[in-house]
Amino acid sequence: MNTTPDTPTPRALRELTPLEARIVGVLVEKQHTVPDTYPLSLNALTAGCNQKTARAPVMSVSEDEVTTALDGLKHLSLVMEGSSSRVPRFEHNVNRVLGIPSQAIALLTILLLRGPQTAAELRLNSARLHGFADISSVEAFLDELAARAQPLVVRLPRAPGARENRWMHLMCGEVNLADFASADAGGADSVPPSEFEALKAEQKRLADEVARLNALVLRMASELGIDVDAQGDAS
């Protein structure tokens, strides 16, 4: 499914930290969504890492933390620092280092920024980076990424009640699929204590309301001389 000619040879990489992965995702995203301000300054890059929307998990990192992570990414050649501006600016080098086409980069970027996604979610959320014709084309590129000698993504076990499998990036290391399946199953079958207490309170409120309405009906029936029990037997 690789449609990009002369794709560079991929390099083996160490596992990234969560912040390093976030930085890579932000740089690719902003290259497409705000091209006029790309490459990004340290301030803009930090803001992108701490962005509240289209991020999972939401982070709160400092410029010093981003600078440290950038040093690691520059050592891996995943990020380059420009020298033509008084303000240091940073750009990604994902296509050359990983040796994957732009379509695959778009999907990987969404996984880096938003966490596990279904193929349908990836198609929707990657629209500003690349427009996929259909879900099958998304799955084809995901399959390629998963089949590499050093896989970049993995298909997760389907959660109970879910219609589709989700995909997860492996840039931060391998995941234990059995643990992931157990976590999904536990999340589907159990109710958090706070939610359970809220349900109990709502049940009591409804029971009290039914009792109040029942008493009101009996009182009104008595005032009108209606025998409620007789009416019930007749029905």
Curated annotation (Swiss-Prot):
Protein name (database record): UPF0502 protein Bcep18194_B0081
InterPro entries found in the cross-reference section: DUF480, WH-like_DNA-bd_sf, WH_DNA-bd_sf
Entry-linked Gene3D superfamilies: Winged helix-like DNA-binding domain superfamily/Winged helix DNA-binding domain (1.10.10.10)
Domain of life: Bacteria
Family label: Belongs to the UPF0502 family.
